Amino acid sequence: MSKVSGGGPCPRRRDGVDPALRSRARRRALQAVYAWQISGGVAKQVIAHFAHEQAYEVADLVYFEDLVEGVLTHCAELDEKLTPYLDRTIEEVDAIERAVLRLGAYELLYRQDVPYRVVINEAIMTAKRFGSKYGHTYVNGVLDRAALALRKVEVLG
């Protein structure tokens, strides 16, 4: 068990993953991807800035870096995978929801160790916290349909 600031012990899964720390890493990754989208910044600078701040917040730094580097590296591919499920161009999607969708698509494609239901639920919770009033419902609909295509065996199994 690990101690999380402001709370009691946080149970780890059998594989050693602490879900609370992963959730924090996702929230920080959202902020980094959002900053990158808005500023058009250099990927390495954005990661370095947020990784430095991340060190002061209890979170899964390795997972944070994987998410941010993965989204920034595979952004065009992620957008291509999301496009069939959008009702507008990716550029027209609200910047927060766009960042959440890209992070969710990255996890669906490249983090097979994370169940698709966890990916979608975490994306919904993040969109509720940071996005527009109904942004989480849009994120849910898009990622739910994307999961069916990207992880068909897992979703239908």
From Swiss-Prot:
Keyword terms: RNA-binding, Transcription, Transcription antitermination, Transcription regulation
Q: Which GO terms describe its molecular function?
A: RNA binding
GO terms, biological process = DNA-templated transcription termination; transcription antitermination
- State the InterPro entries in the record: NusB-like_sf, NusB_fam, NusB_RsmB_TIM44
Gene Ontology cellular component terms for the protein in this record: cytosol
The superkingdom listed in its UniProt entry is Bacteria
What family is this?
Belongs to the NusB family.
Function recorded in the entry:
Involved in transcription antitermination. Required for transcription of ribosomal RNA (rRNA) genes. Binds specifically to the boxA antiterminator sequence of the ribosomal RNA (rrn) operons.
This protein is called what?
Answer: Transcription antitermination protein NusB
